[in-house]
């Protein structure tokens, strides 16, 4: 089996499943093949010629919709009222899926209420960077959020998120009255120290 014909070798890592297990995970070995092919490949690895497979790997494949067909609200440009989030947008990862689901859900609810969508700018948060990148840039592999993708990475910090996103969080309605009061006082305190 030749998965990448231009490569003559491939690095793998043998990782113990846990301290209490004798199972080893062969990280880097492709599992998008039937069991007989997985065994044959494993037997070519020095030291694993007689290894026993505990569970065969499997492949998961996903379809995706080109994110360039979405508005920054994650609503489809082709079908009004249809919002997309997660892997179907060409992203990978729990955080990426969660933040898109949040934005798509908020904007779907706002659409029903005839309210303007909530758009997070690149300068306001990594959610904004992710959405802007997937709808405006071609990404060759599933997209992951990385600080290096943001030109605002020095200002997109956890310690100032409440100042950057407070107004939108308040507008969306995800903050309790107590939290709003607390954050307004915190913002006032920070601003008074900056003057």
Language-model features: locations:
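Mobile, glycine/GP-rich and aromatic-enriched active-site lid/loop segments adjacent to catalytic centers
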Residues: 1-80, 84, 88, 162, ...
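Acidic-residue sensor for enzyme active/binding pockets
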Residues: 15-17, 95-96, 141
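Residue-level signal for pocket-adjacent positions within structured domains
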Residues: 24, 55, 59-60, 65, ...
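A conserved FAD-binding loop/helix module that cradles the flavin
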Residues: 25, 89-109
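Glycine-rich loop(s) and the adjacent beta-strand/alpha-helix scaffold that form part
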Residues: 45-46, 50, 103-111
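Alpha-helix capping and helix-loop boundary segments enriched in small/acidic/polar residues
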Residues: 70, 88-96, 118-121, 153-157
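Non-catalytic terminal regions with compositionally biased, polar/charged low complexity
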Residues: 102, 108, 114-195
């Amino acid at each position: 089996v030749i998965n990448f014909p231009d490569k003559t070798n491939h690095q793998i890592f043998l990782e113990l499943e846990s301290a209490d297990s004798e199972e080893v995970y062969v990280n880097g070995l492709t599992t998008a093949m039937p069991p007989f092919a997985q065994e044959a490949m494993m037997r070519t690895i020095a030291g694993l010629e007689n290894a026993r497979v505990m569970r065969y790997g499997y492949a998961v494949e996903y379809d995706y919709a080109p994110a360039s067909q979405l508005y920054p609200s994650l609503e489809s440009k082709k079908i009004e009222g249809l919002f997309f989030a997660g892997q179907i947008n060409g992203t990978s990862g729990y955080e990426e899926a969660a933040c898109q689901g949040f934005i798509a859900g908020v904007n779907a609810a706002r659409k029903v209420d005839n309210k303007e969508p909530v758009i997070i700018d690149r300068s306001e948060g990594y959610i904004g960077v992710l959405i802007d990148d997937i709808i405006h840039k071609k990404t060759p592999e599933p997209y992951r959020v990385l600080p290096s993708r943001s030109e605002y990475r020095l200002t997109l910090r956890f310690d100032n998120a409440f100042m950057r996103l407070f107004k939108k969080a308040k507008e969306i309605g995800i903050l309790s009255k107590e939290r709003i009061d607390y954050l307004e006082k915190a913002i006032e305190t920070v601003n008074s120290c900056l003057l």
